């Protein structure tokens, strides 16, 4: 009996408990199960946007994790981020409550669907969202489970009525190779999650399995602008693969005539599919988000749309309806005619892409780029230390904060300060500064921001919460400054 069929019978699963339900991947699966009619609850250490959203749907949320939270549950769902010393896991093991990994639960949801799985080191969330928009524009209503909040829906997951399911496939612990997908997307492959894989070749091998595990009637979509992906594609002959890129003239789908500004990107597309005679040109495709990396993400979506015969009109309409993803180059405030952006970039390649986009926009406005970066995880900084030293070239002024641990134990010699020191010693950046307190960002903006500037707040930790408070903080500072000025003026009058 499959999970999606159980509700057609009298069989019940009882209560399904999610440990860490506030995580973006866990919350999406919990929401879909709830919408399917299953009884869902969960716990997390802190309240956030996802826990509040789920609670508003009637899902019981425990803040804090304790063994009594799973008193009456039948199944426990965990992700790889949950420590085995967690009291709820210990209690589940003690009582022999079945523990299901997040990827296994996702696989069950995908099993009866024609599934599109989007993987890669970067760009998964935006690509998943773009593909979903194209499906809807084509008159299909897919079920979507994403790794970020889709602005069109104000959620990261929603239940559709068609036979399609589109999901972000997390490669962090190799469980993505077990997802039963019909269409597989690989956006890029970079050294990441090496604390799990230990060796980059093992990570590449996992992506190979991701493609070769497809059924014979499925297909993969791969970006061959990325040299590791190109080599992988060249080595696989047993599955159909559609390639895309900007720089790769031999790609099946290529973007050209590219123009970008602060709000959008416009480009033409040349399509030359395998075993199809002739070439198709689609002119003036517009996506309402800037950046070369987002053009690449849209090419992956176009590949799926073309292969499934959506039609050019549906593809263009789908992109026009796209409203972006939370924390992907999201404007959160303005100050002194400078734009403040919140972005999820936390890997060197993501940082380079985000800053390149910001630099392009700043140059058009005669402005500069001010980057404020919060490193995420000691292990990531350790494994990619040299890459982090080199990825901030497009920042005119750079501030690096303390490392956001994300539950990790500190590693000796790996700090935000040590990263800045090494960058300075090796002359990789002459305006790199260590920022001990995020609160000092307000004064940094006040002292440095000018018309046309792009201020980029980056990281996967709590820097986003701070970025989203900047509008209020800067306004409060202005009010305080004006009050001080008025007080001084009144004092002079009284004298």
Curated annotation (Swiss-Prot):
<keyword id="KW-0573">Peptidoglycan synthesis</keyword>
<comment type="pathway">
    <text>Cell wall biogenesis; peptidoglycan biosynthesis.</text>
</comment>
<comment type="function">
    <text>Cell wall formation.</text>
</comment>
<dbReference type="GO" id="GO:0005737">
    <property type="term" value="C:cytoplasm"/>
</dbReference>
<dbReference type="InterPro" id="IPR000713">
    <property type="entry name" value="Mur_ligase_N"/>
</dbReference>
<dbReference type="GO" id="GO:0051301">
    <property type="term" value="P:cell division"/>
</dbReference>
<dbReference type="InterPro" id="IPR013221">
    <property type="entry name" value="Mur_ligase_cen"/>
</dbReference>
<dbReference type="GO" id="GO:0008763">
    <property type="term" value="F:UDP-N-acetylmuramate-L-alanine ligase activity"/>
</dbReference>
<keyword id="KW-0131">Cell cycle</keyword>
<keyword id="KW-0067">ATP-binding</keyword>
<dbReference type="GO" id="GO:0005524">
    <property type="term" value="F:ATP binding"/>
</dbReference>
<keyword id="KW-0133">Cell shape</keyword>
<dbReference type="GO" id="GO:0008360">
    <property type="term" value="P:regulation of cell shape"/>
</dbReference>
<dbReference type="Pfam" id="PF02875">
    <property type="entry name" value="Mur_ligase_C"/>
</dbReference>
<dbReference type="InterPro" id="IPR004101">
    <property type="entry name" value="Mur_ligase_C"/>
</dbReference>
<keyword id="KW-0961">Cell wall biogenesis/degradation</keyword>
<keyword id="KW-0436">Ligase</keyword>
<dbReference type="InterPro" id="IPR050061">
    <property type="entry name" value="MurCDEF_pg_biosynth"/>
</dbReference>
<dbReference type="InterPro" id="IPR036565">
    <property type="entry name" value="Mur-like_cat_sf"/>
</dbReference>
<dbReference type="GO" id="GO:0071555">
    <property type="term" value="P:cell wall organization"/>
</dbReference>
<dbReference type="Pfam" id="PF08245">
    <property type="entry name" value="Mur_ligase_M"/>
</dbReference>
<dbReference type="Pfam" id="PF01225">
    <property type="entry name" value="Mur_ligase"/>
</dbReference>
<dbReference type="InterPro" id="IPR036615">
    <property type="entry name" value="Mur_ligase_C_dom_sf"/>
</dbReference>
<protein>
    <recommendedName>
        <fullName>UDP-N-acetylmuramate--L-alanine ligase</fullName>
        <ecNumber>6.3.2.8</ecNumber>
    </recommendedName>
</protein>
<feature type="binding site">
    <location>
        <begin position="120"/>
        <end position="126"/>
    </location>
    <ligand>
        <name>ATP</name>
    </ligand>
</feature>
<keyword id="KW-0963">Cytoplasm</keyword>
<dbReference type="GO" id="GO:0009252">
    <property type="term" value="P:peptidoglycan biosynthetic process"/>
</dbReference>
<keyword id="KW-0547">Nucleotide-binding</keyword>
<comment type="similarity">
    <text>Belongs to the MurCDEF family.</text>
</comment>
<keyword id="KW-0132">Cell division</keyword>
<dbReference type="InterPro" id="IPR005758">
    <property type="entry name" value="UDP-N-AcMur_Ala_ligase_MurC"/>
</dbReference>
